[in-house]
Each structure stands twice: as structure tokens, then as C-alpha cells.
Amino acid sequence: MAKQVFQTTFAGRELIVETGQVAKQANGSVVVRYGESTVLTAAVMSKKMATGDFFPLQVNYEEKMYAAGKFPGGFMKREGRPSTDATLTARLIDRPIRPMFAEGFRNEVQVINTVLSYDENASAPMAAMFGSSLALSISDIPFDGPIAGVQVGYVDGQIIINPSQEQAEQSLLELTVAGTKHAINMVESGAKELSEEIMLEALLKGHEAVKELIAFQEEIVAAVGKEKAEVELLHVDAELQAEIIAAYNSDLQKAVQVEEKLAREAATQAVKDQVTAVYEEKYADHEEFDRIMRDVAEILEQMEHAEVRRLITEDKVRPDGRKVDEIRPLDAVVDFLPRVHGSGLFTRGQTQALSVLTLAPMGETQIIDGLDPEYKKRFMHHYNFPQYSVGETGRYGAPGRREIGHGALGERALAQVLPSLEEFPYAIRLVAEVLESNGSSSQASICAGTLALMAGGVPIKAPVAGIAMGLISDGNNYTVLTDIQGLEDHFGDMDFKVAGTRDGITALQMDIKIQGITAEILTEALAQAKKARFEILDVIEATIPEVRPELAPTAPKIDTIKIDVDKIKIVIGKGGETIDKIIAETGVKIDIDEEGNVSIYSSDQDAINRAKEIIAGLVREAKVDEVYRAKVVRIEKFGAFVNLFDKTDALVHISEMAWTRTNRVEDLVEIGDEVDVKVIKIDEKGRIDASMKALLPRPPKPEHDEKGEKSERPHRPRHHKDHKPKKEFTETPKDSE
């Protein structure tokens, strides 16, 4: 296929798609150029159906450091495991694509996005999402797309599509919305306490922009798209299905309606084991034994799926007996752990999360060195999901994509209410340990995080709570569920997580298994989530009504001062000599950022105060009209140089030493004398003039005697040091400098 180029303008930037030139052995490949960001996307599919009971889709987002003109960090100087941002972007692309494959499709599909050049003002992740959909759509892979996604900001009351870096920094909203031309099917967002109305407006305007991108994709597919391959789908034997339903459906229905999770799981598993044993014996010698037993397992799964949905839509009863808008029993505890800087334990039904707070100096911030310019990350929220939380054995090791994603969601929800660095000069880490799980553990971790922050004395703006909403839809009718449990998440159509304060939403995340949901469903889900959020906040505020006024005794004491950026080198000194001396003298630790924020921490408050005094002295600046106790450090014919403080000297001109005339500076001061001086002038080069006489009483005007002659002039004021007399003088030398 020859190279073809397609071009349009989207959100004020040029969008160019190239096909038929590179990666031609993949089932589908495109090069997407958005602004100066360039992403190569290749999609491939296995020839045969994979084993297993799930669709093996893998989406990668690979950040090549050369794309930003940078070397990879580390000893090897080569890209290694994906960064957290790359992992989150891969999940972001996977989620709207996954529902667009047919039920029963089991061939392995890989979609690989490689960032070849990076423009921070033109979203490479959105280009990758566009490219992923387009590569699948023009390929022979049976993908029921296209889909597209956009980023949405909210600046000065205006909705902005794909905001620039500068706009994103000012935005009150960081939203990614994806979908088909008919409906939204994925949402990911952080927000600064925005109302449900603003969030809904942003979602709908984002979807309008999505439609533009889909229309562009359809134009390209019409020009270069391949015919879709005929692929075997997983279908169960209809006669076998009817036989099992007739014999065992009533038993399975009773098992599904057991309210307690572990008892329900045991009851349903007992039915499945019974059916499996019957058919293993019946078809033990059959040549298609493996296929038959696979069908049996799939039929039992479909029966459980159908019964859960029937209970909710027809009987209006949930598996655990709750109403559709009812939250499970809640419990909140603070100070669960001693010694730590803060802890909170939050329980919702059979979902339980423990959050532990750690505070540290700013030197402990995480340095993020990716495609964007390097920056320091002050707040971290980590989420751990051990297998014992669901009563199972399993893999232990580094966090997977799910744990990284849930941690990031909690981080977005809580980051919106954290105090500024000036208000609270600490690095903050929260770790959520999921101790029990029966659905919505990520939202439990947000609630537990709020408890830990408040108990630890972190002055957050407001408590944050989170709730997960679900959906059961048959295409014509739907039911929105509040606080979904694991079974409802597994067999339902939507997992819509909403976190926020009483004043507004701080985070959204939505994943669906159908091809999209309507504005009507979104509106109802947001309203229902708000009601539930307030109920949870009532419980949190009853447990700890306000942030504690003091940090835990075990938390480090930190104080901060702000210095001018051009003074940083003075505090650090040549080769770090000055700052090392301060640390050695006081025993504190000191962090200085590029904006001039100096953080000093120690367990000893007196040591912190001493270090602050030293640093304040180093960066102190003289000001006109201020008075200083200064030491004479040098004498010249035209005056004396005095040290005001640290390395700051001033000149006291001979004419500014006394109200009476003198021809020798040494008659008034000597090196080492301490004198009071007042700053009278600072020139544009920073040179300082000071005066001694400005602090002395002005002598009265000379009086005339009867002959009209002036009386003798008054004696000069005696100097501080009176160990030797001062010589009188009669001549006034010419002033020179």
C-alpha cells in the first residue's frame, strides 16, 4: 500500500495522519503528527483464539527519551520499565478500546504506541489514543470502532479542548473523555472542587470534540481500511446451555441471593462444582472433552451474570439485600497505629482500607524525569492490594497497572485539597493498604487518606470522600447503583467513581463494558453520587471534626523561610561550603529549591531557630533609614568602612562622623570600634553610605558675643571608647574619595 497523508486542524493545531509507509507488516499502523508530537501506532492480532476466559488485549505507550532530546537516566542510559505516566496513559487508551470488541472474541491483540517526537503543547497521549483507534479501524482486526479521546480544561469559566501546557497549569480541571460518536465510554479526571453541573458540561463538550475526531477517522478508514477478518468467537453449545439452565438455574439463583460475600461465593462455587463434576463424568471419554468443559464453565458464568442483573432490574433487589441507592455500613477510625505521623482506617461493608501518612522534608520529593521537563513531585499516594484482602493466594511483587492506576486516582482526589508549600513545607506520602475488598477499594483508600491527613495535622482545605456508582442496562431500561460491591462491578455495565468535598468534585473515573452511556445516565449517576458522598463525609466528620492543630510528636519539625533567588548561591557558598558549615554547626538538615524556599528540619526546635538566624543574616539586605550597630573594619583618609552585618559593609564619610569638622578620621574612630550608624543612601550598584552624626543631637547655632565675635564652638561628643583622648584640629582637609 502506497503512502497516503490525511490532514485536518483540531483544537488549533495541525493533525496529520500518514499510512502505508512504516510498520507495514502489522495488521494496521499509522503515524500521527499532532503539533510537533509524533506517535507511531501498530496493531497486531494473533492467528488463533487464545486459551483462557478473557480477552487478551495489551496496550503499550512507550516513551522514547530521544523524542524530547533527552538521555535516559540511570547507569544503563537506556529506556527500561515504563514510567508511571506511561503506565497510566496505556490504561487510559486500553479502557475505551476494550468494550469495542465482540463478546466471545479471544484472539490476542496488541496495540503498541511509540512516542517518536514530543511537543509538550500538543498532547502525545491523545495522539496515541487517536492512533490506537485508527490503526485498529483500518486493519483487518474485528474492531467495532472508531473511538477517540480529548483532554478538557476549565480556565476563567471557559471549557478548553486539548489545553496547552500554560493553559493546563491555570486550569481548574484536568479531564480526559473518550467515546464513540454515539456516547461516552471512558472518563478520567481531577478537578478543584467543581460542581456536578460544570463537570457534566465539560463531559458533553468533550464528547462533541470526540465526534470531530471520529469523523476524521471514518474518512481515513473509507480510503485505506482493510476488510475485516473472519475470526472464530467463543460460542457455547446451545443444547448444552439449555440443559444446564433447566437443571441447575434455580440452585444458582438461590446461591446468588445469599447476602454475605464469603457465604455467597461458597454457595455459588458449590453449585458450579456440582455441575462440573456431573459433566466431567458424563463426557470423560468424549473427544471434545476440553471444549465441553470450557462451555460448562462459560455457561455457569453466564447464568450467574444473568441472575444478578435480573435481581436488580426486575426484582429491584441487590445481592446483599440493599436498595439501589443504599450505602453499606460505614466505620471510620483514626490513630489506628502508634509512632506513625498519621493513620486512618475506613470500612464500607466488606471493603476496608488502612491509610498511613508520612511527612518528610522537601529533599524527599520524587524527581520525575520523563518527556516533560524534570520536576519534583511533593505528594505521593500509593495503593497496595494484597491477595489476602479477597481471601486468596496470588502474586506478590512490584505493583501492577491496576495498583498504579488506583493510587493515581486517589492522588488526584486528595491533591486538590492539600495546603500550598508555603503553608505546609513538607513532602507528603500516603500509603493505602487494602485489608478487605468487596468492591470500591480505591474509594475506600481516599476516605482513609482523608482520615490520616486530618489526624496527622495536615491542614487540608476540606475532607474528601469517594463512592463508586454502577449501572445495569438492557438497552432500553437502566438502573444506577450506589456503592457497588464486587459482584455488581463484575457483572454490571459501569464502574463510575466520584470523589469530592461538600463543595465539589475532585476526581472522576468511569469505565464501562457497553459501548457508551447517555447524558441522562451521567446526570443521574452524578446526583446519586453527591448524596452518597455527603453521607460518607458525615461519618468522617463525626470521627474527626477538624484537622488537628499540631503534628504528631514523631513527625519532623520543619520551618521554612523565603529568600531571593539571587541569594541562593550566598547560602550554599562555594562548593557548598557555607551550607555545610551551617549544618555542622546546628545539626539541622536544609533543603533549598530553585524558587528560594529554604526548608530547615530537625527534631530540635532550637537548632532550627539558630539555623534560621544564620541564613537570615546571610541574605539580609541593608535598607535606607535603618540603624545598625556596626564595627569599624577599615579606615581611609576620606572616611571609615563599617561592617553592618555579615558581609555587608558601608562607608561613613568623614563629613558624616560628627557635626563638628575634623581632618583626621583616626581622631574619631579606630579599627575595631563599635558605632551606631544610620543608612542614608544605597546607590544603583548596591554601595551603601551611612552616617554617625545622623544619630547625634544637632548642636545649637553659634551665639555672638558683645563684640560680634563667635563664641568658641562646642566640644565634640565623646566617642564610645574613651581609653585615649582625641586631638583637637583647626584645619579642614579637602574631602576626597
Curated annotation (Swiss-Prot):
SMART domains: KH, S1. Its main location: cytoplasm. Residues 625-693 form the S1 motif domain. Keywords: Cytoplasm, Magnesium, Metal-binding, Nucleotidyltransferase, RNA-binding, Transferase. Residues 691-737 are annotated as: Disordered. Residues 700-714, 725-737 have a biased composition (Basic and acidic residues). Its cofactor is Mg(2+). One of its GO terms (cellular component) is cytosol. Residues 715-724 have a biased composition (Basic residues). GO terms for biological process: mRNA catabolic process; RNA processing. Gene3D superfamilies: GHMP Kinase, N-terminal domain, K Homology domain, type 1, Nucleic acid-binding proteins. It catalyses: RNA(n+1) + phosphate = RNA(n) + a ribonucleoside 5'-diphosphate. PROSITE patterns: KH_TYPE_1 (PS50084), S1 (PS50126). It is an enzyme of class 2 (transferase). InterPro entries: ExoRNase_PH_dom1, ExoRNase_PH_dom2, ExoRNase_PH_dom2_sf, KH_dom, KH_dom_type_1, KH_dom_type_1_sf, NA-bd_OB-fold, PNPase. Mg(2+) binds at residues 489, 495. Involved in mRNA degradation. Catalyzes the phosphorolysis of single-stranded polyribonucleotides processively in the 3'- to 5'-direction. Belongs to the polyribonucleotide nucleotidyltransferase family. This is Polyribonucleotide nucleotidyltransferase. It comes from Streptococcus pneumoniae (strain Taiwan19F-14). The lineage of its organism: Bacteria, Bacillati, Bacillota, Bacilli, Lactobacillales. The gene is pnp.
